[in-house]
Regions:
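Short helices/loops that flank or line small-molecule/ion binding pockets
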Residues: 73-76, 91-104, 118-120, 150-151, ...
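Pocket-lining segment of extracytoplasmic ligand-binding domains
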Residues: 111, 192-282
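Short helix-initiation/N-cap motifs at beta->coil->alpha
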Residues: 85-96, 109-111, 183-198, 210
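Short, polar/charged alpha-helical segment
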Residues: 45-49, 55-100, 117-119, 167-174
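Secondary-structure end/capping motifs
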Residues: 248-328
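Conserved C-terminal helix/tail region of periplasmic/extracytoplasmic solute-binding proteins
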Residues: 319-354
Length: 354
């Protein structure tokens, strides 16, 4: 998808998003389909089973966790089988993976579960990690006169509806008191932001490291600048399709996986040099210097004992999207399977709990 001509809000409506998502099936997800349900039927209101059948198999779409577990020597300790580690990370791709029965559990920011609910895909959040540190920055096009978020009014802003960058943009506008009707949200995916900035197709776009530093190194002399705000992308979540959670064996396996996921992220935080080489250099093919920029910008992992704040944050996100005309307003508490609440926080040292 290329940058569109600037258009008044909304740049991409719900129908457009759903039509786009429906075309993601070309990814060939069927080739890595998750195993069919193998346990007894479990009601979503029933107590979560804890006994894990070692023959239970999950398709886990979290490649970072796979690499963390491998590097830390923990992957062989999983008490269940992993049928595949699909490399799907973007929200629309994961949602289509759920629809195609190809993924049992995935990791995303807070916005994809809202999009899934709006598209009729039933899924639940089963674990939460939080951050209070901004990891995204706003970058201006070369020669732009924008120096603060208060000056976004009347400007063209790159906007990805189904990704965390989109929510960061909406939150920044709300914080600055700028109505959506006073800006031009230009629909594109986040991997197009950098090119759109360089070509002056947009005035402002959300970037993260290492793109932020590399962009300023290349275009700072031409008038590009970084605008820092205190807007955070608060949530990282694990989530699963409802049909998976209604399988007793798979629900138990997911409950057992959550502590591994939480401790794996802590391992990466505590072993930055090894993680840079394992993931950013070895898997993402970045340089060590680029990996160092990313790791330096990352927040310390935190796992909330209570999900109350996470639910409130998710509700705010849903309300922002509804106000912008992208999704209908609803009570987001239905997205959280609170039987899993506390599993992650109980599995980590106290300094990593929130």
């Amino acid at each position: 998808m290329t940058a569109t001509a600037d258009a008044a809000v909304p740049a991409m409506g719900r129908r457009t998003f759903l039509a786009t998502m429906a075309g993601v099936g070309a990814l060939g997800l069927a080739a890595c389909a998750a195993d069919p349900p193998g346990g007894g039927t479990l009601s979503l209101t029933s107590k979560l089973p804890t006994a894990v059948n070692p023959k239970t198999s999950l398709a886990i779409s979290i490649v970072t966790t796979q690499l963390e577990l491998q590097a830390s020597g923990q992957i062989g300790k999983l008490p269940f089988k992993v049928s595949s580690w699909p490399n799907l990370t973007a929200g629309p791709d994961v949602i289509e993976g759920f629809r195609a029965h190809s993924i049992d559990v995935a990791s995303n920011a807070g916005i994809p579960p809202i999009q899934a609910h709006s598209s009729g895909v039933q899924a639940k959040i089963v674990a939460v990690s939080t951050t209070n540190k901004p990891i995204y920055q706003f970058a201006t096009a070369p020669g732009s006169d924008v120096t603060s978020a208060a000056q976004f009014r009347g400007k063209k802003l790159a906007f990805s509806q189904g990704q965390a960058q989109g929510v960061v943009t909406l939150r920044a506008l709300k914080q600055a008191g700028i109505p959506y009707s006073d800006v031009h949200l230009v629909a594109m995916t986040s991997d197009e932001f950098l090119t759109a900035l360089e070509a002056r197709q947009v005035d402002v776009a959300v970037l993260s490291q290492p793109e932020t530093t590399e962009y300023i190194n290349g275009f700072g002399s031409k008038g590009a600048r970084i605008i820092y705000t205190n807007v955070v992308d608060y949530l990282e979540i694990l989530w699963s399709p409802v049909e998976v959670l209604e399988d007793a064996a798979k629900a138990a396996a997911i409950g057992a996986f959550i502590p591994f996921w939480a401790r794996a992220s802590i391992w990466a935080w505590e072993h930055p040099a090894q993680w840079i080489q394992t993931y950013y250099v070895g898997n993402q093919h970045l340089t060590t210097a680029q990996g160092e920029l990313i790791v330096k910008a990352q927040p310390k992992p935190a796992f909330p004992v209570s999900w109350a704040r996470a639910i409130a944050w998710e509700q705010q996100t849903s309300d922002l999207l509804a106000a912008a005309g992208y999704d209908p307003k609803f009570d987001v508490s239905v997205l959280f399977d609170r039987r899993f609440e506390g599993i992650a926080s109980a599995a980590v040292p106290a300094q990593y709990r929130e």
